[in-house]
Amino acid sequence: MKIKKHKFPGVYVFIDEDGSEKIATKNLVPGQKVYGERLIKFEGEEYRVWNPRRSKLGAAILNGLKHFPIKPGSTVLYLGVASGTTASHVSDIVGWEGKVFGVEFSPRVLRELVPIVEERRNIVPILGDATKPEGYRALVPKVDVIFEDVAQPTQAKILIDNAKVFLKSGGYGMISVKSRSIDVTKEPEQVFKEVEKELATYFEVVERLSLEPYEKDHALFVVRKP
């Protein structure tokens, strides 16, 4: 068993006893599990194994993502934070110097995040509607990165609208697109091309990556605000 640094700062490669490689983050709150993930102790540090079947971002990294703008110290706006599975790994990466502002529409789901953020003080939970960024404008500063995981037909527009309000010039957006949430009648490839075209009206599209086999009919886009 061994842990080594990944090419992305704050991400680690965990080599299991059977030789298989997984990804992990250094646990910001040692002893805390967020979603039943495996905790690994190695050379005096504790790491959390990042499950790609529970996290679109984890799936993207394992699939060979080339651009990962979330770094130690980053300020991140997370749209569709849900109960915090992926956000907790982002929290590990950005560390105490960084901040994760997590917007969630469902009060019931956001309540599940409360016990996590009591110890992870770098996550700020916000009850809000990602389609209406003005509603949480007073709570969120300018950010380095926006990550969006909102399964809605207008998800590209949601990223653009939030970037106009919150994203620094030169900052990055990351969006997980589920083709069936946009149009079930079209082939996923057609949907992804249309999303890319819409994103390109405002951003420079830096990368597009399939999330198969972890997520069916999903792609992750990385974009940059000029």
UniProtKB/Swiss-Prot annotation:
S-adenosyl-L-methionine binds at T85, T86, E104, F105, D129, A130, D149, V150, A151, Q152. It is an enzyme of class 2 (transferase). GO terms for biological process: box C/D sno(s)RNA 3'-end processing; tRNA processing. Coiled coil: none annotated. Pfam families: Fibrillarin. Its EC number is 2.1.1.-. Keywords: Methyltransferase, RNA-binding, rRNA processing, Transferase, tRNA processing. PROSITE patterns: FIBRILLARIN. It comes from the Archaea. Disulfide bonds: none annotated. The keyword Ribosomal protein does not apply. One of its GO terms (molecular function) is rRNA methyltransferase activity. Belongs to the methyltransferase superfamily. Fibrillarin family. Involved in pre-rRNA and tRNA processing. Utilizes the methyl donor S-adenosyl-L-methionine to catalyze the site-specific 2'-hydroxyl methylation of ribose moieties in rRNA and tRNA. Site specificity is provided by a guide RNA that base pairs with the substrate. Methylation occurs at a characteristic distance from the sequence involved in base pairing with the guide RNA. Interacts with nop5. Component of box C/D small ribonucleoprotein (sRNP) particles that contain rpl7ae, FlpA and nop5, plus a guide RNA. HAMAP family: RNA_methyltransf_FlpA. This is Fibrillarin-like rRNA/tRNA 2'-O-methyltransferase. It comes from Thermococcus onnurineus (strain NA1).
